[in-house]
Amino acid sequence: MSLDELKLLEGQLLIPLEMYLAAGIRIGTKMKSKFMEPFIYSARPDGLYLLDVKKTDERIRIAAKMIARYDPSKFVVVSGRQYGHRPVRKFCGLVGCKPMLGRVLPGTFTNPALSHFTEADLMMVTDPRVDEQAVVEAGTMGIPVIALCDTDSPISNVDLIIPTNNRGRKALALIFWLLAREVLRIRGDIPPNGELPVPLSDFEARILTTGEVV
């Protein structure tokens, strides 16, 4: 899908096309998995694969409807990626779900005897490779998994793929901001055309002068 073809989608997407492009949503890696091929439309001259923005938009709609059906207190969002910590916290604060940031300890979702055991009916991960422990345990327990998947992501035990750049600060911020908006609209927490009470910029991870990510 060329840029000219993408421009024809204006008015059909949840947000203006420019917002998706500015956030780098479609920028993948130089590797691809056969499972992600249906979501890839081309490759740049530098070898980076590009994801289909229309399919990303479609999957966000599906994910929002799926999330809205679940009790938010039993919905866990996992992010081992530092750049995902802030957007996940913001998303969970608005939606009412549980953030799980950093490394997931073995048995978190499978062993009720552990002090850190967490019961979940639905899980979302920012990267199925980085968050593999959580995804594997979700598969064992029959917990549906929504995953942000890049061009080279593994999809074992993933029930719903959202194709996106899952490494960039702006991309992660936009995905969680948009998903929060759609969930709240579907649940009736904000009007059908309402906006979130916080701006997109609040979802983006920040790098301090010390190098710390917050």
UniProtKB/Swiss-Prot annotation:
GO terms for cellular component: small ribosomal subunit. InterPro entries: Ribosomal_uS2 (IPR001865), Ribosomal_uS2_arc (IPR023454), Ribosomal_uS2_euk/arc (IPR005707), Ribosomal_uS2_flav_dom_sf (IPR023591). Pfam families: Ribosomal_S2 (PF00318). GO terms for biological process: translation. Keywords: Ribonucleoprotein, Ribosomal protein. GO terms for molecular function: structural constituent of ribosome. Belongs to the universal ribosomal protein uS2 family. PANTHER family: 40S RIBOSOMAL PROTEIN SA. This is Small ribosomal subunit protein uS2. It comes from Thermofilum pendens (strain DSM 2475 / Hrk 5). The lineage of its organism: Archaea, Thermoproteota, Thermoprotei, Thermofilales, Thermofilaceae. The gene is rps2.
